[in-house]
């Protein structure tokens, strides 16, 4: 479980708090989407959770461990993050080297490392690219490698920070399917930082940020149907929902099957 209490963060030379007295909790094993406009504080929170930023004040607790300078390494072993631009995460000369990097730091035997690399590269559909240089991959392929590298370390919490924002529709769909697969087959706590409701719609529930504050929480459908919150957080409605809104006699829905059922009645 992740507990955040009275969290404040202010960037140097800024007169406003990026996170302003934020209190929330995220249950273990749930998929949570954090929504909000640019500058709402959602990505700042993700960087605090992985120990990259130190809070101005307040408390962060992950799995019973309070985040501080002494516990930072332990917390970082529990939390993995995939960034918006995976190029910022690549270390190895090849896909294989990149997935292996964190495993080598765990002092695992080479046979075990090879086994883990094979398993997770196949899981994300990148096994045939193991000898490829990361910079020669497409955006979607790079994100898959970044996800494999994090999964290989077996963290308890995985944060996806705007992972689809730079991808084309095909790449975006591919990554969302992969996240859905991780959600269904693993007991991980997943946190998706996004402003895209297409990404958030498959979460168990959503947290909505605006100006560094938590302004709403609830199931994706409830958030989507709250026009005030949608406008405040500048949330972009899913494509299916936009279509259903324009069809006369159709109840707005984000579910494609439900929309087809209504049309065919």
Curated annotation (Swiss-Prot):
- Which Pfam families would you find in this protein's record? ABC_tran
Localization of this protein: Cell membrane
Q: Which UniProt keywords apply?
A: ATP-binding, Cell membrane, Membrane, Nucleotide-binding, Translocase, Transport
Q: What is its EC number?
A: 7.-.-.-
| CC annotations in GO | ATP-binding cassette (ABC) transporter complex
Tell me the protein family, please. Belongs to the ABC transporter superfamily. Energy-coupling factor EcfA family.
Please report the name of this protein according to its UniProt entry: Energy-coupling factor transporter ATP-binding protein EcfA1
At the highest ranks, the source species' classification is: Bacteria, Bacillati, Mycoplasmatota, Mycoplasmoidales, Metamycoplasmataceae
Q: Which gene encodes it?
A: ecfA1
